[in-house]
């Protein structure tokens, strides 16, 4: 049984006004399912079920079993529209997953051994926190690991240095873009401290 499941119902009342009514009156999240050889479907889901599903970060990059009126299909999250202030999901886009057919998905990065460069006096900047990948459904990773343990102050990590899991391709590299993933830099001196030292020097 799929660890990630979501129930939904088809909706025929479309448009921005209808979507607002769904959210306000029925606590529902409007969504669209597309891809494969089927026509796009407009659906709605209980907001509380969507929120519960997304409590697990793995859901963002995992195949979800979507039950629409009793008919099950496998999908992945393509995009989420959130409320700018409250953060809850206002609309969702799902893409159907077809066995044997490659898919494109966004996968989070998990950084390992971050304490090592920090102990050497460095500060870590995460330039990229998720990656777009292409693979077959069976090869879809929940995350990509990046080990920072060997980095020194001044070092950085680029996408080309990462080893993609078997069967997985990084979309950016395929398009000739070598993304910066993370870097280790010397701690920035707080401006107030610099001013304080300057004042002390002037007083002397």
Curated annotation (Swiss-Prot):
CDD domains listed in its UniProt record: Ribosomal_L25_TL5_CTC (cd00495)
Pfam family of the protein (one): Ribosomal_TL5_C
GO CC annotations, alphabetized: cytosolic large ribosomal subunit
Gene3D superfamilies, A to Z: Ribosomal protein L25, beta domain, Ribosomal Protein L25, Chain P
GO biological process: translation
Gene Ontology molecular function: any one: 5S rRNA binding
Keywords linked to the UniProt accession: Ribonucleoprotein, Ribosomal protein, RNA-binding, rRNA-binding
Highest taxon of the lineage: Bacteria
Matching InterPro entries: Rbsml_bL25/Gln-tRNA_synth_N, Ribosomal_bL25/Gln-tRNA_synth, Ribosomal_bL25_b-dom, Ribosomal_bL25_C, Ribosomal_bL25_long, Ribosomal_L25_dom, Ribosomal_uL5_bac-type
Family: Belongs to the bacterial ribosomal protein bL25 family. CTC subfamily.
Subunit structure: Part of the 50S ribosomal subunit; part of the 5S rRNA/L5/L18/L25 subcomplex. Contacts the 5S rRNA. Binds to the 5S rRNA independently of L5 and L18.
Functional note: This is one of the proteins that binds to the 5S RNA in the ribosome where it forms part of the central protuberance.
Name the record gives this protein: Large ribosomal subunit protein bL25
Record organism: Pseudomonas syringae pv. syringae (strain B728a)
């Amino acid at each position: 049984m799929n660890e990630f499941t979501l129930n939904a119902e088809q909706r025929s009342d479309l448009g921005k006004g209808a979507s607002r009514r769904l959210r306000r009156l029925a606590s529902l999240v409007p969504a669209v399912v597309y891809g494969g050889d089927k026509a796009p479907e407009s659906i709605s889901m209980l907001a509380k079920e969507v929120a519960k599903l997304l409590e697990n970060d793995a859901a963002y990059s995992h195949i979800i079993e979507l039950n629409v009126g009793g008919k099950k299909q496998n999908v992945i999250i393509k995009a989420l529209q959130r409320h700018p202030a409250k953060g809850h999901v206002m609309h969702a886009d799902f893409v159907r997953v077809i066995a044997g057919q490659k898919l494109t998905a966004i996968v989070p990065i998990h950084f390992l051994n971050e304490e090592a460069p920090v102990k050497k006096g460095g500060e870590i900047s995460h330039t990229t926190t998720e990656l777009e990948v292409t693979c077959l459904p069976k090869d879809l990773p929940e995350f990509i690991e990046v080990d920072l343990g060997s980095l020194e102050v001044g070092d950085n990590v680029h996408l080309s240095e990462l080893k993609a899991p078997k069967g997985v391709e990084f979309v950016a590299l395929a398009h000739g873009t070598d993304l910066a993933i993370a870097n280790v830099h010397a701690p920035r001196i707080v401006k107030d401290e610099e001013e304080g030292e300057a004042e002390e020097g002037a007083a002397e």
